[in-house]
Structures are given as structure tokens and as C-alpha cells.
């Protein structure tokens, strides 16, 4: 991946756990010949100079500023407040928090141990209660203080212990926080809970873990449903699949939770997949836009959902690259997009040419591809 990060910002641009290829450990890969090291250094310096020119406004536009066709707010219509209150754990960039907010829930608090992620939520929702850093460490919280004040607990515990990207050590991984999520639910006893994670956690390898850590302790108090959902089936132009656990308290006199049905058809965008959704044929559902169409880019004759966007919360690289594997890099190239150095704005991206001439993404573009409302 010669110099593909373009010497970009050292801030996060992605928002989720990887599918593969990002659990980096050790420094063995850094032992490279001096000649190649010098070549990388020259590429990096040239990229930084080009970036400086783009950020200063001195560089000319290499393309028009794109105007997205997809408005993600239309995928999650804003609903009236109904009085139910939601507490967020492992909040990250606030995706679940925003979803529950738009669904009419009153935000109680967000807990996120990484300061910069908590700062992101605060910047976008300054009126919310956000606990970051030490305050966001869920292992140190007595959740009984929230009993009677929270109706739903939701969160996505760190996925690295279960992702195919890593060693999949499960409960032996210090980052396994599912027991803390379960502790929170049992101490607060909300009316309902929702947890999500990578599909790897639903694999046979982790069946005993899921049963002993999630289903049995929560099943004492809740009717629990496990199911999977794919983002493109709900109009999001990104290849993202997640497993969910949703529970409704047994004494709540509420109907059993029913997973949502797909709202969009994406058969026309699934030619690269091993299994094809909606394989019964055409449906009456609206079609999910491909990534190019969603971002308002010219029709090249080929479009597809974007590959799973890499989280910059994983691994030691701290770059604005959102590519998570060589296979994903090829898929980005197929749709003419450059994922290795996300620009801070569309204006800057329009002045900062990618090495291969492909469309350089901006933070706002990545938000659209992930379904984040503006």
C-alpha cells in the first residue's frame, strides 16, 4: 500500500470495527530495506506538501465539489418524543445514540472511554450528557443509580475479541466488555436492551460464550432475540453486517421484539457477494443507491455499495485511511474511490488529487456512506 495514506490527518474518519486485516500487533512489518524506506519517505513528503496546498486554498480544484444525492436523514425519519429514555454504552462516534434520538427516545447519557470519540459526540450534540475518558469507563460505574431513570440500554461492546480481523480470543481478550454490558442491564433492569457486534460473534466457535455470557444471564429477566441485519437492506450504501441481541423485560407486558424487515432492495448492487439478498427476484421496495450515486458522482457504468469502512479506533496506525484489507482496496478502486486519506471537507478533497486520479473522499462523504444524518 505504498504511501496510500497520503500523509493524512492523524484523526479518525471511520466509525466501526473492521471485518478483516486491521488487528495489527508488533513491529515486524516495519523492517524494510533502506531504498524502499526512502521511497516511502519521498511519497509521504510530496503528499504532505500537496495536502498543505489544498488546505491553504492555494491549490486549484482538480474536480468540482460533489453534491450527494442521498440524504441519510431520509433513512431514519425523525419521530415525535414518546417519553422513553435511552442510555448508551461504548458509544464510539454516536451512531446508535443518534438512531435512538431520531426514534423519539430521550437521551440520558453516553459512556465512551476514548476521549476523542466522546469529544466527537459532544461537538455534534452539545446539550447531551457525555462521559468520556475515565468517566466513560463502564467498569467503574455503579449502574444501580440509574434504576428507574432508564427505559432502554444500548451499545456495541468492543468487537476486536470476536472479529475475524484479530486473534478471536473472546473472553480471554482484555477488551471483552460484554460482561460489563450485561452487568449494566442487570443492575438497571430497563424495559429493554439492544446490543450489537460483528457477525463473528455468532459463529459456532463462540456459541458457548454467547450462551453463558449473554443469553443465560439476561434470559433470566428478558425475552431475548438474536438476529442479523445488513446495512444495504435499509438503504445505507455500505457493506456492513452485524449481529444484534434485543431483549424485552418479561414483566413489562409488552409484545416480543420483532426484528425490522428490510426497507430497501439491493439485489442490483450485490453481484460481488457470495450470497445474494432478495433472491426471490424484484421487489416493490425502493432500491439502495450505490456509493457513487449516493455521493452524486458521474455514472461510470459500475456502482456498488462501499466496502465496510474501517474504524480508526482499531490498531496503532492512527490514519485517515478507511480501507481494511487488500480485497476492500480493490473494491474501492472498482468504484473509482480513494479511501486512503480522507479529507476534512469536500472543498479540500476537491483540491487534493489522489495519486491514481480516483475520487478522494471527505469526512462528510464518509458520513453519507455510513448513513449518518447531517
What residue spans do the PLM features occupy?
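Residues at the C-termini of beta-strands that transition into short coil/loop
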Residues: 90, 111, 137, 228-230, ...
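Residue-level signal for pocket-adjacent positions within structured domains
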Residues: 133, 157, 196, 224, ...
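Class I S-adenosyl-L-methionine
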Residues: 141-152, 160-335
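Core alpha/beta nucleotide-donor-binding catalytic domains of modification enzymes
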Residues: 40-43, 47-192, 199-212, 216
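C-terminal target-recognition/interaction regions appended to catalytic cores
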Residues: 2-43, 50-55, 72, 286-374
Amino acid at each position: 500500500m505504498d504511501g496510500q495514506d497520503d500523509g493524512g490527518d492523524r484523526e479518525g474518519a471511520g466509525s466501526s470495527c473492521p471485518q478483516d486485516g486491521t488487528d495489527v500487533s508488533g513491529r515486524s512489518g516495519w523492517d524494510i530495506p533502506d531504498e524502499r524506506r526512502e521511497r516511502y519517505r519521498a511519497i509521504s513528503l510530496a503528499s504532505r506538501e500537496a495536502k498543505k496546498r489544498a488546505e491553504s486554498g492555494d491549490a486549484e480544484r482538480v474536480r468540482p465539489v460533489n453534491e450527494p444525492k442521498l440524504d441519510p436523514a431520509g433513512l431514519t425519519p425523525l419521530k415525535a418524543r414518546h417519553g422513553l429514555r435511552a442510555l448508551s454504552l461504548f458509544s464510539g462516534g454516536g451512531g446508535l445514540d443518534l438512531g435512538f434520538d431520531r426514534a423519539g427516545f430521550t437521551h440520558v447519557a453516553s459512556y465512551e472511554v476514548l476521549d476523542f470519540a466522546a469529544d466527537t459526540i459532544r461537538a455534534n450534540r452539545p446539550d447531551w450528557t457525555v462521559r468520556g475518558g475515565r468517566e466513560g469507563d463502564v467498569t467503574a460505574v455503579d449502574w444501580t443509580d440509574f434504576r428507574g431513570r432508564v427505559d432502554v440500554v444500548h451499545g456495541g461492546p468492543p468487537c476486536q475479541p470476536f472479529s475475524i480481523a484479530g486473534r478471536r480470543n473472546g473472553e480471554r481478550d482484555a477488551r471483552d466488555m460484554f460482561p460489563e454490558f450485561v452487568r449494566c442491564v442487570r443492575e438497571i433492569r430497563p424495559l429493554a436492551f439492544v446490543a450489537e457486534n460483528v457477525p463473528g460473534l455468532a459463529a459456532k466457535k463462540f456459541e458457548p460464550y454467547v450462551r453463558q455470557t449473554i443469553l443465560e444471564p439476561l434470559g433470566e429477566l428478558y425475552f431475548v432475540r438474536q438476529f442479523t441485519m445488513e446495512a444495504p437492506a435499509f438503504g445505507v450504501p455500505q457493506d456492513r453486517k452485524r449481529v444484534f441481541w434485543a431483549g424485552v423485560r418479561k414483566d413489562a407486558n409488552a409484545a416480543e421484539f420483532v426484528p425490522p424487515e428490510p426497507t430497501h432492495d439491493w439485489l442490483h448492487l450485490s453481484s460481488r457477494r457470495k450470497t445474494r439478498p432478495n433472491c426471490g427476484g424484484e421487489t416493490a421496495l425502493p432500491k439502495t443507491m450505490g456509493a457513487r450515486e449516493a455521493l452524486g458522482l458521474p455514472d461510470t457504468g459500475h456502482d456498488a455499495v462501499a466496502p465496510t469502512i474501517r474504524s480508526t479506533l482499531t490498531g496503532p496506525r492512527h490514519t485517515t485511511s478507511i480501507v481494511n484489507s487488500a480485497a476492500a482496496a480493490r473494491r474501492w478502486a472498482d468504484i473509482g474511490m480513494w479511501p486512503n486519506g480522507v479529507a476534512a471537507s469536500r472543498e479540500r478533497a476537491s483540491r487534493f488529487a489522489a495519486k491514481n486520479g480516483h475520487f478522494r473522499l471527505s469526512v462528510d462523504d464518509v458520513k453519507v456512506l455510513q448513513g449518518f444524518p447531517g
